[in-house]
Amino acid sequence: MKKLIVTADDYGYTKAINEGIIRAVTEGIVTDIALMVLTDPEDLEHGLKLLKDHNLNEVGLHTSLFHWGKTERPGRGDFIKFFKEASDNEIEKRALSEIAEFERLVGAKPKFISPQFNMHGNLRLLKIMAKYVVANNIPMRIPRALIEIEEITDSNYSAEIYLKRLGVKMTNHLYAHILGADTEAIKQSFLHELGSVQDDESVEIILHPGYNDQITLESSSLNYERARDLSLALDPIFSKNIQDLGYTFSHMSSLWSQK
């Protein structure tokens, strides 16, 4: 049986995104939530309350390193500049501080680690995160090439091999279609990709479901795409198509039972 994990990124960013993701989990195919903890306190607390109210525990850390809020949002250039100029100690301090904040807020270690902007493609950061996940038996998202483009199609074989040698658990495949207005075309692309997976392999699909309010429209680079992904997550035909391909919906935390 093939495993499919469907992760909703950007939880905690705005209330509208929080509410859309909760619906995508409780009524749709989303299995795991990637939580940002360096967001505006009001939006973060709103998200944490919803997790508690709905008894949702499959929550991982969506590493961002910088504060993301209504009036402050880093761009790719900020990350490139940071990794170019920061010392190893500065990167480690910022990364471990963010992990500690997740543990403090959630009251548990993250069920998985995933990055904003593919930043785990930076090998200095990757080594820090790998040390943490190995020590705590936590899966990671497959690393991709670093933050140069919106899509995450570029493989990062050196980073993958490094993690595999350490014994870090990852899915066998990672699929995402971040941009695009044609919902049906994206659905068919996902199904085509899923159809190529071998039995007993695992896949993570990344979605960005959410509602749009004024704050989200003004502060996020993804707007229509969030409504599109919420529609995909709630589509019963899409869910059935996936199951007809031999998939069972699972969680990142289940990867520790995967050989």
Predicted segments with their positions:
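Terminal accessory/targeting
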Residues: 1-5, 15-57, 63-106, 112, ...
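Gly/Ser/Thr-rich loops at beta-strand to alpha-helix junctions
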Residues: 117-122
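DG-centered beta-turn motif at the end of beta-strands
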Residues: 8-11
